[in-house]
């Protein structure tokens, strides 16, 4: 049992330090992913591409092209189709490497995969200004290449947590790790707004230079402090190493160093896996809709100008970050104290997260003129409550298929990446004039998808390691010499 081995403190510890380094890795990864969404606002000269017709009145205020673009004059004369091509190109690359990332991490180690993908993304990010000034097609190809590299990053991190994360600490450790993505969003929005106006080389290029350098520096730290497994980490204490190895082996078997073959048929026919994928797609639909469309929604409904947009749009992501970590602590506490089983903890997290987000988003769409603060409160609450999903499907990947968590999550990321392509296009199609009624349709659609995803997850999810994921010695793991009751207790507490 897990209690048979003395539990070393989580803070400070090597496993928690690894989660902090991964936190900053996710932070810089998301900064490189989302920088274009905001930079393009000051890259494109809307005065030249606008039809000259005044925008729809926002609560009685007519927004002319000059007013809506602040003091920034864009360098490029791109129309909306070109801008959309540049913004969506990332996801066309992103969708192509998810499964590869999990497989490579299992075979060669997550440390190397994360290092190569983030370093490559950082170097290509530094080339964004050169590509943009060459042609919009060169920029789109470059963004697709960045997406391809980043597609392998998160499955590789998940693969590492399958061997680094004791089952009863997974919610906290993965929560800290992936919360970095939200802080990346918080930083990149106001940073981009500031650099657009005051940055060097024309303003917007400095966004890519600064973030790219940050990415390169992070990879140097990562290579020094990380290790594929606790057994190979040079600075971990013997007590912590033994605790992690014993806890992980109790649920997935003893690692023999062999690389197991992936049971694709069993994965693709597993209801528990499809439950994660359904929740994953729904959660990402909501996230991508808000990530790409939130600035436009706030501008259309509230009439915010460029200089204030970044700061306001960051507020929901701060709440999101706090909720992810609080949810992880709460989930692990409920499980360790026996208040809820693993399965019911994951169900509760997904139902509250996704349905709650949908309710708040729909409510925000019905706020009237003069209720700007209320709109922001609703959006913030919706984003915050959605952070509980990190204690749902995200951790559940590690619980149902520890040896194949990177591959299974990578496949889920491939499916959910479609949301990154489809949801912005749907939002643009439904909001040609940016009216409140049009945005209400977008928010109702998002709420419907969130609800369906939460229900499917709750019906078909599992809290136990699936039979096909409990490996034998021939398949790469030797089952630990523990009683069956002990294995189940650790995996499903």
Swiss-Prot record:
<keyword id="KW-0739">Sodium transport</keyword>
<feature type="transmembrane region" description="Helical">
    <location>
        <begin position="175"/>
        <end position="195"/>
    </location>
</feature>
<feature type="transmembrane region" description="Helical">
    <location>
        <begin position="375"/>
        <end position="395"/>
    </location>
</feature>
<keyword id="KW-0325">Glycoprotein</keyword>
<keyword id="KW-0472">Membrane</keyword>
<keyword id="KW-0406">Ion transport</keyword>
<feature type="glycosylation site" description="N-linked (GlcNAc...) asparagine">
    <location>
        <position position="35"/>
    </location>
</feature>
<feature type="glycosylation site" description="N-linked (GlcNAc...) asparagine">
    <location>
        <position position="69"/>
    </location>
</feature>
<keyword id="KW-0769">Symport</keyword>
<feature type="transmembrane region" description="Helical">
    <location>
        <begin position="144"/>
        <end position="164"/>
    </location>
</feature>
<keyword id="KW-0813">Transport</keyword>
<dbReference type="InterPro" id="IPR011701">
    <property type="entry name" value="MFS"/>
</dbReference>
<feature type="transmembrane region" description="Helical">
    <location>
        <begin position="205"/>
        <end position="225"/>
    </location>
</feature>
<dbReference type="GO" id="GO:0022857">
    <property type="term" value="F:transmembrane transporter activity"/>
</dbReference>
<keyword id="KW-0915">Sodium</keyword>
<feature type="transmembrane region" description="Helical">
    <location>
        <begin position="10"/>
        <end position="30"/>
    </location>
</feature>
<dbReference type="InterPro" id="IPR036259">
    <property type="entry name" value="MFS_trans_sf"/>
</dbReference>
<dbReference type="InterPro" id="IPR050382">
    <property type="entry name" value="MFS_Na/Anion_cotransporter"/>
</dbReference>
<feature type="transmembrane region" description="Helical">
    <location>
        <begin position="85"/>
        <end position="105"/>
    </location>
</feature>
<feature type="glycosylation site" description="N-linked (GlcNAc...) asparagine">
    <location>
        <position position="47"/>
    </location>
</feature>
<feature type="transmembrane region" description="Helical">
    <location>
        <begin position="272"/>
        <end position="292"/>
    </location>
</feature>
<dbReference type="InterPro" id="IPR020846">
    <property type="entry name" value="MFS_dom"/>
</dbReference>
<feature type="transmembrane region" description="Helical">
    <location>
        <begin position="406"/>
        <end position="426"/>
    </location>
</feature>
<feature type="transmembrane region" description="Helical">
    <location>
        <begin position="112"/>
        <end position="132"/>
    </location>
</feature>
<keyword id="KW-0812">Transmembrane</keyword>
<dbReference type="GO" id="GO:0015293">
    <property type="term" value="F:symporter activity"/>
</dbReference>
<feature type="glycosylation site" description="N-linked (GlcNAc...) asparagine">
    <location>
        <position position="305"/>
    </location>
</feature>
<dbReference type="Pfam" id="PF07690">
    <property type="entry name" value="MFS_1"/>
</dbReference>
<feature type="transmembrane region" description="Helical">
    <location>
        <begin position="441"/>
        <end position="461"/>
    </location>
</feature>
<feature type="transmembrane region" description="Helical">
    <location>
        <begin position="311"/>
        <end position="331"/>
    </location>
</feature>
<keyword id="KW-1133">Transmembrane helix</keyword>
<dbReference type="GO" id="GO:0016020">
    <property type="term" value="C:membrane"/>
</dbReference>
<dbReference type="GO" id="GO:0006814">
    <property type="term" value="P:sodium ion transport"/>
</dbReference>
<comment type="similarity">
    <text>Belongs to the major facilitator superfamily. Sodium/anion cotransporter family.</text>
</comment>
<feature type="glycosylation site" description="N-linked (GlcNAc...) asparagine">
    <location>
        <position position="433"/>
    </location>
</feature>
<protein>
    <recommendedName>
        <fullName>Uncharacterized transporter slc-17.2</fullName>
    </recommendedName>
</protein>
<feature type="transmembrane region" description="Helical">
    <location>
        <begin position="348"/>
        <end position="368"/>
    </location>
</feature>
């Amino acid at each position: 049992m897990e209690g048979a081995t003395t539990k070393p403190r989580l803070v400070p510890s090597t496993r928690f330090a690894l989660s902090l380094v991964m936190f900053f890795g996710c932070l810089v990864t998301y900064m490189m992913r989302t920088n274009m969404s905001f930079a393009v606002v000051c890259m494109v000269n809307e005065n030249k591409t606008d039809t000259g017709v005044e925008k729809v009145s926002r609560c009685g205020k007519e927004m002319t092209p000059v007013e809506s673009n602040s003091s920034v004059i864009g360098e490029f004369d791109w129309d909306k189709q070109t801008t959309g091509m540049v913004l969506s190109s990332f996801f066309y690359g992103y969708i192509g490497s998810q499964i590869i990332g999990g497989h490579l991490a299992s075979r060669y180690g997550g440390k190397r995969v994360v290092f190569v993908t983030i370093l490559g993304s950082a170097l290509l990010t530094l080339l964004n200004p050169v590509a943009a000034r060459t042609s919009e097609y060169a920029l789109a190809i470059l963004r697709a290449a960045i997406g391809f590299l980043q597609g392998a990053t998160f499955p590789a991190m998940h693969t590492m947590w399958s061997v680094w994360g004791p089952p009863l600490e997974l919610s906290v450790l993965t929560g800290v790790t992936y919360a970095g993505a939200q802080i990346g969003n918080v930083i990149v929005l106001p940073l981009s707004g500031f650099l657009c106006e005051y940055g060097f080389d024309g303003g917007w290029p400095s966004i890519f230079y600064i973030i790219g350098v940050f990415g390169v520096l992070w990879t140097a730290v990562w290579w020094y402090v990380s290790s594929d497994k606790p057994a190979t980490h040079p600075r971990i204490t013997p007590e912590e190493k033994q605790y992690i190895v014993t806890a992980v082996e109790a649920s997935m078997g003893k690692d023999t160093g062999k690389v197991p073959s992936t049971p694709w048929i069993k994965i693709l026919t597993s209801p528990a896996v499809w439950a994660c994928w359904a929740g994953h797609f729904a959660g990402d639909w909501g996230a991508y809709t808000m990530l790409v469309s939130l600035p436009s929604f706030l501008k259309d409904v509230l009439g915010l100008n460029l200089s204030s947009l970044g700061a306001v749009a960051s507020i929901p992501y701060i709440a999101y970050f706090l909720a992810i970590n609080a949810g992880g602590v709460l989930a692990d506490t409920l499980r360790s104290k026996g208040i809820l089983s693993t399965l019911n903890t994951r169900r509760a997290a997904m139902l509250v997260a996704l349905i709650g987000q949908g309710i708040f988003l729909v409510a925000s769409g019905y706020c009237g003129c003069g209720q700007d603060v209320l709109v922001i409160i609703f959006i913030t609450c919706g984003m915050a409550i959605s952070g509980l999903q990190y204690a749902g499907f995200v951790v559940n990947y590690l619980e149902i298929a520890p040896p194949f968590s990177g591959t299974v999550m990578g496949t889920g990321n491939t499916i959910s990446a479609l949301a990154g392509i489809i949801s912005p296009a749907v939002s643009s199609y439904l909001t040609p004039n940016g009216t409140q009624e049009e945005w209400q349709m977008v928010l109702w659609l998002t709420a419907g998808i969130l609800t369906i995803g939460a229900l499917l997850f709750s019906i078909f999810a599992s809290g136990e390691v699936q039979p096909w994921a409990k490996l034998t010695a021939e398949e790469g793991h030797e089952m630990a010499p523990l009683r069956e009751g002990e294995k189940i207790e650790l995996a499903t507490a």
